[in-house]
Curated annotation (Swiss-Prot):
This is Dihydroorotase. The lineage of its organism: Bacteria, Fusobacteriati, Fusobacteriota, Fusobacteriia, Fusobacteriales. NCBIfam families: PRK09357.1-2 (NF006837), pyrC_multi (TIGR00857). Signal peptide: none annotated. Its cofactor is Zn(2+). It comes from Fusobacterium nucleatum subsp. nucleatum (strain ATCC 25586 / DSM 15643 / BCRC 10681 / CIP 101130 / JCM 8532 / KCTC 2640 / LMG 13131 / VPI 4355). Zn(2+) 1 binds at residues 56, 58, 147, 300.
Amino acid sequence: MLLKNCKILKNTKFEKVDILIRDNKIEKISENIDITDENIIDIKNRFVTAGFIDVHVHWREPGFSKKETVYTASRAAARGGFTTVMTMPNLNPVPDSVETLNKQLEIIKKDSVIRAIPYGAITKEEYGRELSDMEAIASNVFAFTDDGRGVQSANVMYEAMLMGAKLNKAIVAHCEDNSLIRGGAMHEGKRSAELGIKGIPSICESTQIVRDVLLAEAANCHYHVCHISAKESVRAVREGKKNGIKVTCEVTPHHLLSCDEDIKEDNGMWKMNPPLRSREDRNALIVGILDGTIDIIATDHAPHTMEEKIRGIEKSSFGIVGSETAFAQLYTKFVKTDIFSLEMLVKLMSENVAKIFDLPYGKLEENSFADIVVIDLEKEITINPNNFLSKGKNTPYINEKINGIPVLTISNGKIAYIDKEEINL
């Protein structure tokens, strides 16, 4: 496959090149590659970069295929420019043993159009009491997490970190102290009071991060914080890094894009976990990106049925979809307004992910895996969930206009998504 007339970023400047793909690798990147026997695709001077890597998606299968399937989720991710994703273990059965993990791996092998690497659960059934069969499943999982809930026992988390260090696997944490949730459904603040909805305080997240950073130091383990949302959490991670502790973290697009003030009414589409916090918290997240405290962006793509999201904030399920719109929303909100550079954004979604988790992906260079996304930076669409490839339509960003639309995604040398109106084969 030969991609002609590509525009790539090199040393902060655009260069026009051709990219030759053979098998699953990038064989050559050069001006004017002239090979006639290849499948030639004219990219028409669109932006080309390494495929995005998302370390936080809920693909819902096995167990919850009413919400999403591997088939639909992988195509949605490819449409958003993702070529590698890591799937969360809050499934049925939970991947906490070789047998249960294999059920998920079989579905991925059969139905996914992109590279998908499962997480293993930290604890059996994600109950937080007894460690899963971590040693037995380590070779086939990306890392370990009980995402969807916090590990409440410090001792269980410490034992998990000791095992993670032994296996050279990260411990990835959804940080939430159950004793501080107090029946809340959105951020505890002025807006929750105005809407008459019980709130979840920021300390519900940040206190568990502080605990875990110290445990990670004691265990000498790579500790990664999921979907950071509060200013105190950013501070805790920043201090951990300053002290040489192996702590990294991610932020979601929606926590960068919005805050609780954007919730104008009691609408379950705005319910997510962690919740959208204050304007001050959102600003702290942006500063955390700019100063390097926050390492990467991950979507926390969490599809639900419409029935689960139309019950108001208190009774709806937590979660928002993001695979198909993440890059475009961030490009529109932050790159077009000169808050982030284009180079910074693509690194946050690809190269940085590969770097902190030591992955052989996230590079657009010769001999690297042919994981590529072609983006039309000028193309504008209006977000319409009815057009999503995901089964999940649960987004509050309906009718938002966005630029920077992926039109071709190649994962491991194979076309995973193509906009046939924009790209001619």
